[in-house]
């Protein structure tokens, strides 16, 4: 379903009583079944926006349509005392044993982590943890997935690999996805729509018309979009 943010306000109070306004009267709409990337300089409220949509922080205004969401954090947040299988199973409390087994098998096969089902997080590499986090989010079977800097700690080869896993899972089960990133090429690879945040507002918005599967981010259209994005971010 579409997510509609209406007149969002969010402020933080520092220890010395100084108030920081992150959002004031902010509105946006995230289209049903689309992948939206949120770009912008550090400190403009990208992660705060996700936290508001995911109900992880208090806020003023209204957010319609988010419902229950799956969240992929920058630091993965796998449960250390549970195996890979257990971490994914944890998101399926109401499913039958057979349903859990089937769903977990499916997502682990997609990210090629079946052989790590009984491993604990401390036994996994950074890339493997990220793949488990994505698998867990899709296994939860929520309509909305939020991702905060999902690939920031990975090298280029791993980014490419995990981005491909992400695209494959979305082809099988379309979701409304919002992800925060500093990486313009990552946004161009994965997103249907890209927003640029500046000073608590959307300063630029553009659609990427080419299908995600097989998208050539070196092509003429994408290069034109890239140029506009850099201009918007560097304002």
Stretches found by the model and what they are:
Residues 3, 22-25:
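Conserved structural motif at the start of ABC-family nucleotide-binding domains
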Residues 13-16, 58, 86-101, 110:
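ABC-type ATPase nucleotide-binding domains, specifically the catalytic core motifs of the NBD
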Residues 39-41:
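The feature captures the beta-strand-to-loop junction immediately N-terminal to the Walker
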Residues 54:
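Helix-to-loop junction immediately C-terminal to a conserved catalytic motif
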Residues 120-124, 128:
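Conserved ABC ATPase signature
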Residues 134:
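Hydrophobic anchor residue at the start of the ABC signature
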Residues 139-143:
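A short, proline-enriched helix->beta-strand linker immediately N-terminal to the Walker B motif
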């Amino acid at each position: 379903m579409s997510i509609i943010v209406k007149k969002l306000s969010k402020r933080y109070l520092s220890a010395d009583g100084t108030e920081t306004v992150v959002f004031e009267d902010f509105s946006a709409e995230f289209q049903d079944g689309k992948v939206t990337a949120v770009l912008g300089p550090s400190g403009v409220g990208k992660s705060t926006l996700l936290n508001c949509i995911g109900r992880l922080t208090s806020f003023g205004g209204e957010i319609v349509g988010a419902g229950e969401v799956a969240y992929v954090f920058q630091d993965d947040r796998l449960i250390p005392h549970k195996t890979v299988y257990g971490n994914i199973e944890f998101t399926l409390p109401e499913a039958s044993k057979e349903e859990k087994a089937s769903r977990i098998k499916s997502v682990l096969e997609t990210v090629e982590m079946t052989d790590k089902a009984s491993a604990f997080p401390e036994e996994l590499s950074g890339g493997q943890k990220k793949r488990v986090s994505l698998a867990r989010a899709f296994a939860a079977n929520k309509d909305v997935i939020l991702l905060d800097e999902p690939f920031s700690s990975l090298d280029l080869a791993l980014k490419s690999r995990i981005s491909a896993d992400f695209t494959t899972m979305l082809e099988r089960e379309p979701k409304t996805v919002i992800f925060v990133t500093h990486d313009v090429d990552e946004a161009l690879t994965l997103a249907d729509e890209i927003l640029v945040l500046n000073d608590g507002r959307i300063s630029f918005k553009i659609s990427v018309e080419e299908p995600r599967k097989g998208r050539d981010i070196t092509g003429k259209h994408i290069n034109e979009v890239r140029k506009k994005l850099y201009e918007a971010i560097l304002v």
